[in-house]
Amino acid sequence: MTAIAPVITIDGPSGAGKGTLCKAMAEALQWHLLDSGAIYRVLALAALHHHVDLASEDALVPLASHLDVRFVSTDGNLEVILEGEDVSGEIRTQEVANAASQVAAFPRVREALLRRQRAFRKAPGLIADGRDMGTVVFPDAPVKIFLDASSEERAHRRMLQLQENGFSVNFERLLAEIKERDDRDRNRAVAPLVPAADALVLDSTRLSIEQVIEKALQYARQKLALA
């Protein structure tokens, strides 16, 4: 009988540092990486490209069922490929982020993408980045981490990220959007953003990314008994 590949789930709100942590852990452990948020962003982008109504669950489900998405890790960077095109930059805009939160609220859309996400589970292991990885997608994962940070700190990080990419941003507006998104994600009927009962809750507000990575890797290795 073939053993099921282990999974480390990293859940948490937007801007908490999940992406950076997951890439660092995947590199340290030499495991596969799933950015589930990117899948929802890719779906949102595909909907925008194909002029699909973001408010129509019936229209979004077929698109989700046939979504052509894959991840390619190159020199520590994660390329997100949609229909053969690198959309890594395009999916990181605030417009797509807000649209992704909208489409993720639909139960049948989430169900359509669930099987695709679980297919990323392969040996030697998987680092799964998302919002419901430990509660819904991989409830049997041996290691679960919920990475959090204050909304103000997350807005500040997002502002710096956007400015580095040449975007002009208003902090107060960005903070309001993050709070609105948090409220939507935490209170949706299906797969709300909550820590799994057996997850380590790690607050990164006053921690450097190096400290976050060190704490997460130490916890994961203890749980998995990895040297």
Swiss-Prot record:
Organism: Salmonella choleraesuis (strain SC-B67)
UniProt signal peptide: none
Enzyme Commission no: 2.7.4.25
SUPFAM superfamilies: P-loop containing nucleoside triphosphate hydrolases (SSF52540)
Family: Belongs to the cytidylate kinase family. Type 1 subfamily.
The keyword ATP-binding is assigned to this record: yes
Gene, per the UniProt record: cmk
Chief place of localization: cytoplasm
Enzyme class: transferase
Alphabetically ordered keywords of this record: ATP-binding, Cytoplasm, Kinase, Nucleotide-binding, Transferase
CDD domains: CMPK (cd02020)
Compartment(s) where it occurs, according to its Swiss-Prot or TrEMBL record: Cytoplasm
A molecular-function term among this protein's GO annotations: CMP kinase activity
Binding site for ATP: G12, P13, S14, G15, A16, G17, K18, G19, T20
Family annotation (HAMAP family): Cytidyl_kinase_type1
Highest rank taxon of the organism: Bacteria
Catalytic activity: CMP + ATP = CDP + ADP; dCMP + ATP = dCDP + ADP
Protein name per Swiss-Prot or TrEMBL: Cytidylate kinase
